[in-house]
Amino acid sequence: MQDAVPRLTFTLRDEERLMVKIGVFVPIGNNGWLISPHAPQYMPTFELNKAIVQKAEHYHFDFALSMIKLRGFGGKTEFWDHNLESFTLMAGLAAVTSRIQIYATAATLTLPPAIVARMAATIDSISGGRFGVNLVTGWQKPEYEQMGIWPGDDYFSRRYDYLTEYVQVLRDLWGSGKSDFKGDFFTMNDCRVSPQPSVPMKVICAGQSDAGMAFSAQYADFNFCFGKGVNTPTAFAPTAVRMKQAAEQTGRDVGSYILFMVIADETDDAARAKWEHYKAGADEEALSWLTEQSQKDTRSGTDTNVRQMADPTSAVNINMGTLVGSYASVARMLDEVASVPSAEGVLLTFDDFLSGIETFGERIQPLMQCRAHLPVLTQEVA
């Protein structure tokens, strides 16, 4: 039984529709975002991610983002047990691309802000001003306990206080090249960073809790959130509304970028068959680890990203919104995503990244109203 594609709930003027950005969430960890031995199995390498991002650039994707993961979930698929490091990967990708925006993720418990400020300024130089930083507080305790740097479980309730000080130091150093910031977590004494970035450095976050959205409203340039459900492209809208309301309190414009997985094929039935096959092989041991870790934070409320990731409804792809269908169906659903007010962009993952980006560029994107402004491609990337 196919999921019906819902009718459009929102409408935007044509000129507003053209603003939607498309990004790729590169597979910095093994097997991407499908926790199943029935899905493609692969290790993360620079060459793989280089091919993915160069192909994305060819098809006019606007940005590429890598996460950071320091310990995986185990299981028979060894899910995310094998990971590259985000800043060094994205520095390499910045050097082999020319137009696409590049974002690395800082695990802020592991890197002092002054070091991140300098690394970001370096990649700004490599990329010619195409670099930005995604800041994460850290939710998976074993990632940090293994290195002896977990600050204690009180951190769950203070992590955005920590991140607030962190970003203030970053802004000082990127803005003036100097910081004398004094806080509960950081003390800067005539700290210097030079050269500074050539353009204002973009900071992004992925807060869905009230505290996370309040942080993004004050300090982020845009905020990532999860899509929800299977073939329910506008179900995330209440989250985008909450982000918009939080930003209104600070007088800033902070749009939402929505995370979706695309599983597409010639027909709805063929795409659905792939999705059901992936789900049938779900790695229960790895999923149990995710569920266990999601329960460690008892202080951040029920609306956090990790709570959604561990929901059993569609845990095989950590419950990101999933668009399953023919190329035309997926294009139509992505136009529905773009119709939601304050949804400024979409971050995509694929079951198979190389073929997925190619079919997106050749078969899906040309059907999308919100991408109709793009030039017609004449030559495929190697």
UniProtKB/Swiss-Prot annotation:
Gene3D superfamilies xrefs: Luciferase-like domain
Molecular-function GO terms, alphabetical: alkanesulfonate monooxygenase activity; uracil oxygenase activity
Induction context: Up-regulated by the nitrogen regulatory protein C (NtrC also called GlnG) and repressed by RutR.
Family under the similarity heading: Belongs to the NtaA/SnaA/DszA monooxygenase family. RutA subfamily.
GO biological process, one term: uracil catabolic process
This protein's record includes keyword NADP: yes
Species, as recorded: Shigella dysenteriae serotype 1 (strain Sd197)
SUPFAM superfamilies linked to this entry: Bacterial luciferase-like (SSF51679)
Residues binding FMN, per UniProt: I68, K69, N134, E143, R159, Y160, S209
Entry keywords, A to Z: Flavoprotein, FMN, Monooxygenase, NADP, Oxidoreductase
HAMAP family tied to this protein: RutA
Pfam families per the UniProt record, alphabetical: Bac_luciferase
Function: The FMN-N(5)-oxide reacts spontaneously with NADH to produce FMN. Requires the flavin reductase RutF to regenerate FMN in vivo.
The encoding gene: rutA
Top enzyme class: oxidoreductase
InterPro entries with a match to the protein in the record: Luciferase-like_dom (IPR011251), Luciferase-like_sf (IPR036661), Pyrimidine_monooxygenase_RutA (IPR019914), SsuD_RutA_monooxygenase (IPR050172)
Protein name: Pyrimidine monooxygenase RutA
Catalytic activity: uracil + FMNH2 + NADH + O2 = (Z)-3-ureidoacrylate + FMN + NAD(+) + H2O + H(+); thymine + FMNH2 + NADH + O2 = (Z)-2-methylureidoacrylate + FMN + NAD(+) + H2O + H(+)
Enzyme Commission designation: 1.14.99.46
Sequence intervals crossing the membrane: none
Hydrolase found in the keyword field: no
